[in-house]
Amino acid sequence: METKSQNLKDKLYMWYKVRELQSKGLNKTQIGKYLGVDRSTVRRYLRTSREELFRKQNSHREYELKLGKYEEYVRGTLEEYPYISAARMHDWLKECYPDFPRVCDKTVFNFVDRIRRKYGIGKKSEVRIRRDYEKLPETPYGEYAQADFGEKWIPVKNGGSTKVYFFAIVLTRSRYKFIHFSRRPFDTELAIYAHELAFQYFGGRPEKIIYDQDRVLIARENLGDLILTGKFQSFIKEQHFQPVFCRRSDPESKGKVENVVKYVKENFLVARVLQDIPGLNEEARKWLERTGNGKVHGTTRLVPSEEFAVEKGYLKPYYGLPQPPQEQMKEYHVRKDNTVQYRGNYYSLPCGTYRSGQTRVWLQETEGYVELYSKETGKIVARHPLCTRKGKTIYDERHRRPKSIGAQKLAERILVYVSGNREVALWMENLKRKKERYYKDNLEVVLHMMPGYDKDILIEAVHICLDKGIYNGDSVKSLCEHVHRRRNKETETDRTDSCPPRQTGLIQSYNEIFHGYDKT
């Protein structure tokens, strides 16, 4: 009611003001400019009498809401899911009501907002499944370290800003830290160099280092089995430490180093002006001495540098000499079709990489591969075999992965092919339990190769995998080919010799097939 009264007062003031200005000799255009309204509004006030203004204000027309009949549905949905957005509600309305009228998003937003205010339904955060935590015992001295990469924009000496990239590693027992900065994104060679600088700084190396599944270190995945880059694999063998990779997109399983990355961003790099990278790394070493490793740790209540004096005696010796890698990365323009032109060929990038004509990526050629890194995050976004021909488009199907049938349908097709064999069903159940993320990919490999073999061959191959604890579609494929060749050879042998074939060669062949596959 107060709003209506105020509205009437405003209109009365405008009505009197328009007439006052007209009496002073101003025309409609001049009055409009003075009051900040349109000329037609001035004309409307001049044509309206004072009594008519009161009459219009007191008469209220009731308009039927265009979405009024959906009020109960929207109200019930909001009461059950108060965190739902107007955009999602719009989609649900179209899904539940095929005859839902064509209205703009703003109309639905206003309607949902009106119902929230009418029934007092506030927008709450979505209830998430609570994750259980427990305090783990401290790891032994010298056993574990955790490593990760970070980046941040910082101001530069001559004005503007630039992004710096850094490698962080922390010894999990003493919380003793090391960081190394770079102007370019980390690739495998630069990451190895940072590792060696850390080992030199520590005066030794731990037995195991925990990482994210970062493509700087991982070349590809073989249906759940991680294949490391050649240079990083050689570095591991040379330094004799064991890499441990966390589950993808699960930073809470590697919390210590995640906190170090955050600590560097929110403490050391805050308001720090970049002079040059060597200077920044020198400043970082001094910061580690006085703050990062020199102050009492918030969790352990111990000073990392003092604890490190104990842990240092448990580290494995490091005898190497860090050698900085040569600068190899160059900037390349991203085309509208999400490709990069390099040496007369086109290499694909994930859909959506291109955003404008200024989009750039870092490109590096290494070990017969073309690696493309995001200039924004420094992360590797694509890796292709180097093509020696010209005019070719090298495309990664993951960059435009089509929708396909579900994993359950694939499993049903395989079971139909093997007439419901129990061992095949058990193998697929175990595969799903052990590699749920890659379950469908493994089934697709089996499904695609099935038409080339009899069901008895497939059953025997799966039986061998089940017996040896191997859950990998490529292993099944290799074994099917091996069993097929063996049966053909046995058939030919039976024609010429009644002696059974030797089994030692068969076992040796199986071992060769399984070599390189992780049993888990």
UniProtKB/Swiss-Prot annotation:
Residues 136-312 form the Integrase catalytic domain. Residues 13-78 form the HTH IS21-type domain. It comes from the Bacteria. One of its GO terms (biological process) is transposition. GO terms for molecular function: DNA binding. InterPro entries: Homeodomain-like_sf, HTH_IS21_transposase_type, Integrase_cat-core, IstA-like_C, RNaseH-like_sf, RNaseH_sf. SUPFAM superfamilies: Homeodomain-like, Ribonuclease H-like. Pfam families: Mu-transpos_C_2, rve. Keywords: DNA recombination, DNA-binding, Transposable element, Transposition. The keyword DNA-binding applies. PANTHER family: TRANSPOSASE (PTHR35004:SF6), TRANSPOSASE RV3428C-RELATED (PTHR35004). Involved in the transposition of the insertion sequence. Belongs to the transposase IS21/IS408/IS1162 family. NCBIfam families: transpos_IS21. This is Transposase for insertion sequence element IS21-like. It comes from Bacteroides fragilis. The lineage of its organism: Bacteria, Pseudomonadati, Bacteroidota, Bacteroidia, Bacteroidales. The gene is tnpA.
